[in-house]
């Protein structure tokens, strides 16, 4: 019997796949536990429509992320911090500071967890910081740290 899996089933397949299952296994286990639905023409058509709408949604998210990456690359930020001799900062500039400054200066809201900063910035100067906006979409933010 052909069934459409509504959830991942170990040993059978992943969610959204149309697979063959024995009649008894489908009727006695998969259907009662809502793990699968019978693969009728209507159900298969609905599944295909859902897959296409999900793909369109993913493409739209990627396009929005690419636009945001371009906007970020054209929006350098400037942070003024207290520094001592040799250009070392008192304290440091973290991803949280970068996210807040980006929102204040350019009205671009980014989650601080998306900012890739291996270690906090502790020196004056210009830095290039990567921001992971989506899978495969990375924006480069230019940060200029000046002395107060």
Swiss-Prot record:
InterPro entries per the UniProt record, alphabetical: Ribosomal_bL9, Ribosomal_bL9/RNase_H1_N, Ribosomal_bL9_bac/chp, Ribosomal_bL9_C, Ribosomal_bL9_C_sf, Ribosomal_bL9_N, Ribosomal_bL9_N_sf
An example Gene Ontology biological process: translation
A UniProt-annotated Pfam family: Ribosomal_L9_N
Gene3D superfamilies listed in its UniProt record: Ribosomal protein L9, C-terminal domain (3.10.430.100), Ribosomal protein L9, N-terminal domain (3.40.5.10)
GO molecular function, one term: structural constituent of ribosome
Keywords for this protein: Ribonucleoprotein, Ribosomal protein, RNA-binding, rRNA-binding
Entry GO CC: ribonucleoprotein complex; ribosome
HAMAP family with a match to the protein in the record: Ribosomal_bL9
PANTHER family: 50S RIBOSOMAL PROTEIN L9 (PTHR21368)
Similarity comment: family membership: Belongs to the bacterial ribosomal protein bL9 family.
General function of this protein: Binds to the 23S rRNA.
Entry protein name: Large ribosomal subunit protein bL9
Gene name linked to the record: rplI
């Amino acid at each position: 019997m052909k069934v459409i899996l509504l959830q991942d089933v170990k040993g059978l397949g992943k969610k959204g796949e149309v697979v063959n299952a024995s009649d008894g296994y489908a009727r006695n286990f998969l259907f009662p536990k809502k793990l699968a639905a019978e693969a009728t023409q209507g159900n298969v058509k609905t599944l295909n429509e859902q897959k296409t709408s999900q793909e369109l949604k993913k493409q739209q998210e990627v396009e929005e992320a690419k636009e945001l990456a371009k906007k970020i690359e054209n929006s350098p930020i400037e942070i003024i911090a207290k520094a001592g001799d040799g250009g070392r900062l008192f304290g440091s500039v973290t991803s949280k500071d970068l996210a807040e400054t980006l929102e204040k200066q350019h009205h671009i809201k980014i989650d601080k967890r998306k900012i890739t900063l291996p270690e906090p910035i502790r020196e004056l100067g210009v830095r290039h910081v990567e921001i992971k906006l989506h899978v495969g979409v990375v924006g480069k933010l230019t940060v200029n740290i000046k002395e107060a």
